[in-house]
Amino acid sequence: MMVNKKEKKLGFTTIQHIPRTKYGLSNNDYCVADAIYHLSNNPNSIVFGWCFATRETLGSFFDLSKRTIINSINTLKAKDLIEVDNQTKYLRTTQKWYNEFVLYQETIQKKYKG
């Protein structure tokens, strides 16, 4: 008997490799941080400013295990790229992520648009 699971997948992640390698992040680490950034900035979120997706849900986006997500979260936290609320375990990216990754991407886009 086949069980029909409702899968949650993200379409794509544009990886900025220069800052990724500068911070020693794997592609998985980058994808996890990028998902946290976008989920915590969703204006329709019931908890604006925080990503409240479970580790399992984050894993389902990329076909990664819960353990892999936890390892990525630990890596990102150690590099001060995300923070974890100790009480709720919600996640959000830090100003450092924004400065080093989001602004980098915006700078590149502007450079090649005009």
Task: Label each PLM-derived region with a short phrase.
Residues M1-L64:
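Short recognition helix of helix-turn-helix/winged-helix DNA-binding domains
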Residues K66-G114:
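Winged-helix/helix-turn-helix nucleic-acid-interaction surface
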